[in-house]
Amino acid sequence: KVMNKYMNIVDKPAVDGYDIITTIDVGIQDIAEKALVDQLKNLNAVWGVAIVMDVATGDVKANVNMTRGADGNYYEMKNLAVSNLMEPGSTFKTASIMVALEDKYITPDYEVDTQSGIVNMHGSWMRDWNWHRGGYGKIDVTRILEVSSNVGVSSIIDKFYRDNPQKFIDGLRRMSIDKPLNLG
């Protein structure tokens, strides 16, 4: 079932091999799919990914990948979470915000002026994806994560860790972000 439509399934004869065990929860998958599509429409985004993980066990409860088709509707075309090669920027934004929250420098309603979506940070231009449309202006941390604002996250980290970058690195290490996952 994808986007409330049942797809044709091609039955193939079973082949002996290993058992596959999934941790996907169909109810959570449906909720995540609806939430992702709602946000994709709200943001007029081309594609998006939502993954829900049980942090206590590491079990993936939902993995939703939606891409806008030529007709303007969203479809699950491929697993973007594992197939697209990209910099870890947006993932790292969440970790960066978590460090600043844990260090009690910010709260979810802390506001940052992202200006017109483009700012000069130490001689380099930092841009939000929509800078050519005027950016976001003043937004809170929740909105910074929602729209994946480069300017917002960078401004927070620069303001609170500029004089002590090691404290930021230590915060990331508290999350074991520097440890291998040993998935192989």
Positions of predicted regions on the chain:
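Beta-lactam-recognizing serine transpeptidase/beta-lactamase-like catalytic domain environment
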Residues: V2-D11, I24, G48-M86, M98-G184
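Conserved, well-ordered alpha-helix/loop/beta-strand core segments that scaffold catalytic motifs
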Residues: N4-G48
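Short alpha-helical catalytic segment bearing the HExxH-like zincin motif
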Residues: S90
